[in-house]
C-alpha cells in the first residue's frame, strides 16, 4: 500500500509476491520492469498456505484444489492488470532457471538493458534450494 520506497529502489531487484504487484504505482516515470517467476501450482501452494497461516487468513484452511483455483485466478488478474498498464514484464520459468541458469540470465539481462553480469547471475542459482518440486501444471500464461 505504501510504495514511497520505490524511487529509492531504482536499479535494484526487489522481490514482490504476485498478489501485491497491482499495488505498484502505474507511473511510467518510475521505469520499473517485472521479471515474473513462474512455478507449477503444486510448488507454490505449500508456501502460499504457510504465508496465509502466518497472516491468520482463512485461505490457509482451504482444500488444495480450492486454494489452487483461488491462486490461479489471482495470477490471471495480476497478469491482466500488468498487461493493461503496459508494464514491461518478462515471464521466466523457475525450472528453466534451475536447469539452464546461463540462458535465463542472458534473457533477464537483455530485458533489463544488457548491463548485468550474466556469469555472476548464473552462478548464483543453487539447484539445492529448489524446494517443493512438482511436475504439475504451470501458472497461467502471460496475456499477449
Describe each PLM feature range.
Residues 1-14:
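Conserved substrate/cofactor phosphate-moiety recognition/catalytic segment
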Residues 1-2, 121-144:
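PAPS-dependent sulfotransferase catalytic core
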Residues 11, 17-117:
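PAPS-dependent sulfotransferase catalytic domain
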Amino acid at each position: 500500500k505504501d510504495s514511497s520506497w520505490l524511487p529509492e529502489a531504482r536499479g535494484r531487484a526487489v522481490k514482490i509476491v504476485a498478489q501485491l504487484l497491482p499495488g505498484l504505482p502505474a507511473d511510467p516515470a518510475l521505469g520499473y520492469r517485472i521479471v515474473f517467476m513462474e512455478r507449477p501450482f503444486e510448488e507454490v501452494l505449500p508456501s502460499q498456505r504457510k504465508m496465509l497461516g502466518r497472516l491468520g487468513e482463512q485461505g490457509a484452511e482451504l482444500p488444495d484444489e480450492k486454494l489452487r483455483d483461488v491462486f490461479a485466478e489471482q495470477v490471471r488478474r495480476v497478469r491482466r492488470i500488468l498487461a493493461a498498464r503496459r508494464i514491461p514484464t518478462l515471464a521466466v520459468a523457475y525450472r528453466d532457471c534451475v536447469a539452464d541458469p546461463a540462458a535465463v540470465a542472458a534473457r533477464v539481462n537483455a530485458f533489463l538493458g544488457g548491463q548485468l553480469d550474466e556469469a555472476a547471475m548464473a552462478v548464483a542459482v543453487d539447484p539445492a534450494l529448489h524446494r517443493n518440486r512438482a511436475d504439475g501444471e504451470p501458472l497461467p500464461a502471460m496475456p499477449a
